[in-house]
Amino acid sequence: MANNIKLSILTPQKTFYVGDVKEIITRTVEGEIGILPNHTDLVAFLTPTETILVEEDGSRKKVFTSTGILNVGESEVSFMCDASEWPDEIDIQRAETAKERAEKRLKTSNNIDVKRAELSLSRALARIKTKND
C-alpha cells in the first residue's frame, strides 16, 4: 500500500504541478471529494474550485483548478484542467471584474449564453476564494 499519491496537474499551457501528496480535496460536478492513497479508480468532471493538496509533512497548499477531467488511479491522480493557479498568481482585480461582468450578464435577459455566464462566475468566485482564504 502506498502512503502517498503521485499527483499531476496539467493545463493546455504547461505541466503545472507534479509531486507526491498525502491527500487531495477538490470538487467535481458531483460535489466535493477527498482522495487518499489507494482510492477507488475514478474519472470525473472538475468544476472551478479551490483544491487543497495535503503534503507529506501535513502542510496544506491551495491551488485554483478550473474545469477539466480528474483521473484517479490506485496511487496516481491526474488533473487535466483548463487553468490552474497558485494564490499568488491570481490577479484579484481581474477576478473581481470577471465576477461583476458575469453577474451583470446573468441579470439581463438579452440573449446571453447563461451557461457560459454561470461558468465565468464560477471561475471568478473560485479564484477569489483561493486568493482570499
Curated annotation (Swiss-Prot):
GO molecular function: ATP binding; proton-transporting ATP synthase activity, rotational mechanism
Location relative to the cell: Cell membrane
Membrane topology: Peripheral membrane protein
Transmembrane segment boundaries: none
Main localization (coarse): membrane
Keyword Membrane in record: yes
InterPro entries hit by this protein: ATP_F1_dsu/esu_C_sf, ATP_synth_F1_dsu/esu, ATP_synth_F1_dsu/esu_N, ATP_synth_F1_esu_C, ATPsynth_dsu/esu_N
Matching Gene3D superfamilies: ATP synthase delta/epsilon subunit, C-terminal domain, F0F1 ATP synthase delta/epsilon subunit, N-terminal
Keyword Oxidoreductase: no
NCBIfam families for this protein: ATP_synt_epsi, PRK13450.1
Free-text function comment from the UniProt entry: Produces ATP from ADP in the presence of a proton gradient across the membrane.
Family: Belongs to the ATPase epsilon chain family.
Record-linked HAMAP family: ATP_synth_epsil_bac (MF_00530)
Protein name, per record: ATP synthase epsilon chain
Provenance organism: Clostridium acetobutylicum (strain ATCC 824 / DSM 792 / JCM 1419 / IAM 19013 / LMG 5710 / NBRC 13948 / NRRL B-527 / VKM B-1787 / 2291 / W)
Encoding gene (name): atpC
